[in-house]
Amino acid sequence: MARGVNKVILVGNVGGDPETRYMPNGNAVTNITLATSESWKDKQTGQQQERTEWHRVVFFGRLAEIAGEYLRKGSQVYVEGSLRTRKWQGQDGQDRYTTEIVVDINGNMQLLGGRPSGDDSQRAPREPMQRPQQAPQQQSRPAPQQQPAPQPAQDYDSFDDDIPF
C-alpha cells in the first residue's frame, strides 16, 4: 500500500528577523513567518485584488543555523518542507493548536534575489542552501570567505556498495 505525501513548497518573503534557539542536545531551531501573496482581477469590479497568507516555518539542524544567519526580514526565500500540527495546553487550560511548515534534513531552503534593502552585511550566498549529507564539521558557522558547504552527491549509484541490503 502506498504511503501518503506530505510536502509543502513555498516562495515568499520573510516577515521578521529569524528567531534561533538551541535545544538541550545542541541542535538549532529557527522560526520565521513567511508571507505568500496571490493576486487576481475581480470579475465584477475589474479591480486588481491581492490576498496574503502568513505561514509559520520551523527549521531544524544545520538548516536552522543557516536560516538564522542569512535570512532577514524581507528576504525572498524558497522553502520545501512538510506540514505538522502541534497541540499544547495554554495557561488557561484550553487546548491550543498550530500548523507549521517543518524544514528538517529532508527539506530544502534557497535564498532568492539579493539582500533586502538596509542590510549592509555581506553574508548572503547566492546559491541553494541544503543540509550537507555528511558528518557535521567542528565549526558551526562558516566564515564569509570560506567555500560554501558541499552539496549532497547527485550520483546515488556510487553509494550502492555501502548499503547493507
Swiss-Prot record:
UniProt-annotated stretches for the region Disordered: 109-165
GO MF terms, alphabetically ordered: enzyme activator activity; single-stranded DNA binding
Organism for this UniProt entry: Pseudomonas aeruginosa (strain ATCC 15692 / DSM 22644 / CIP 104116 / JCM 14847 / LMG 12228 / 1C / PRS 101 / PAO1)
Source taxon at top rank: Bacteria
Role, per record: Plays an important role in DNA replication, recombination and repair. Binds to ssDNA and to an array of partner proteins to recruit them to their sites of action during DNA metabolism.
Subunit structure: Homotetramer.
Cystine bridges: none
Claim: S-adenosyl-L-methionine is one of the keywords in the record: no
GO CC, alphabetical: nucleoid
Any single biological process term in GO: DNA replication
Residue intervals of the SSB domain: 5-110
Organism taxonomic ancestry: Bacteria, Pseudomonadati, Pseudomonadota, Gammaproteobacteria, Pseudomonadales
Pfam families: SSB
Compositionally biased intervals (Basic and acidic residues): 117-129
Chain positions of motif Important for interaction with partner proteins: 160-165
Name used for this protein in its record: Single-stranded DNA-binding protein
Biased composition (Low complexity): 130-144
Keyword Cytoplasm belongs to the record: no
HAMAP family per record: SSB
Keywords: DNA damage, DNA recombination, DNA repair, DNA replication, DNA-binding
InterPro entries referenced in this protein's UniProt entry, alphabetically: NA-bd_OB-fold, Primosome_PriB/ssb, ssDNA-bd
